[in-house]
Amino acid sequence: LGDVYYAEATYLRRRGVPTWGVFTDKSKQGGGPLIDIGTHALDLTLFLMNSYEVDYVVGTSFEKLGTLLDPEFQGQVDRMGNQNSWNNKTYDVEDSAVGHIKMKNGAVINLRAAWAINMAEDNGANNEAYATLVGTKGGLDTVSGQARLNHVVASQPAITMVGNKVASYIPGFSAGPAPVSKEHDIWVKALRGEGDLFVTADQAFVVTRILDSIYESSRTGKPVYFD
């Protein structure tokens, strides 16, 4: 990809508020889609960029549809295909959030996350976290779990699908129906001291700090600078 200078981390649900547990209770959950599903998109994007040094973060969280829509107007269908709705009277987390992340190497990441937003789910994501990377030699995005490389071949723009799953081109993973089982194996081996984690605790902390900074920036209206 060359020098990756721009990226997008996205996890959008047009209507997909989790109605079980404490997801819509800020006192117990801490936040809404940003901390629930946005974290997966950001984690994937940072990992693919292999860049974790942040300059500053600015962002906004929105509390619009979660409290605005009465149950009969929510139009939400759960994963089993049944009509489902949330209680808009007790909903007190954001329903969507956006963040702008400036890295110390000059690269920029735009993060979008939503449980409820009047925007069609794009890029064929099929209710998944996906990433888009833009570099000087080519670009890469993840489409329904596949990696799509756009580059130049024989002086012509070309699109190449890389493996049948994003995990297929990450060292240590193999293409298959359940890459999550590989994640479990790697985690257990790391606990036993038999191998290393792909994502370190320090890298995971950067993800958490970015999300917290988006919430802080939304509250204060100011960017949050990292050390």
Please annotate each region the language model reported.
Residues 1-91, 221:
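Predominantly a Rossmann-like dinucleotide-binding segment in NAD(P)-dependent oxidoreductases
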Residues 34-38, 197-204:
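Conserved loop-to-helix N-cap of the C-terminal "lid" that shapes the substrate pocket in Rossmann-like
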Residues 41-42, 183-185, 211-212:
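A general structural signal for well-ordered alpha-helical segments in protein cores
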Residues 61-92, 98, 102-105, 120-202:
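C-terminal glycine/acidic-rich active-site capping loop/insertion
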Residues 109-111:
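Conserved short beta-strand elements that form part of the metal-binding/catalytic scaffold
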Residues 113-115, 146:
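A short beta-strand motif that forms part of the nucleic acid-binding face
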Residues 204-218:
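C-terminal hydrophobic helical "lid"/dimerization subdomain
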Residues 222-227:
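Terminal low-complexity tails and localization/encapsulation signals of metabolic enzymes
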